[in-house]
Amino acid sequence: MTAETTTATKTVLIVDDDEEIRHVLRLLCESEGLEVIGEAANGVVAVPMALKHQPDFVILDFMLPRLDGEGAAEILRAVTPKSKIVAFSAILDSQPVWADAYLNKDRITELMPLLRTFIR
């Protein structure tokens, strides 16, 4: 089974305040067959998107304006309990308790193998 057929129905919400990073993440996810249901620059925008679409994955930056990753994750756990939250940060050096997985931004090439661990 290929990665594309495995992930074809999986959805992802991308939350990062850097537009270029969101764009790269979108391209990466879509190239692997994931459906990007939305992008948000902060947690305040992300929460209603997640509530509406119930994504399989939320790629969530830690340092966000208005509502940071930790605060957003707390709300997301309540409104989208089945969503897997991936902390995606340049400043965290280990997995925070609020995330299902952690990936440093300088290791972006490891994102898809990480997401595949949840798909199997």
Regions found by a protein language model. Give the residues of each.
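Non-catalytic signal-transmission and effector/linker regions of two-component phosphorelay proteins
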Residues: 1-11, 109-120
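Two-component/phosphorelay signaling modules centered on CheY-like receiver
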Residues: 19-38
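The feature encodes the CheY-like receiver
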Residues: 65
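Acidic catalytic/metal-coordinating carboxylates
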Residues: 42-45, 68-71
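Active-site residues of response regulator receiver
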Residues: 16, 61
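Conserved phosphotransfer cores of two-component systems
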Residues: 51-53, 75-83
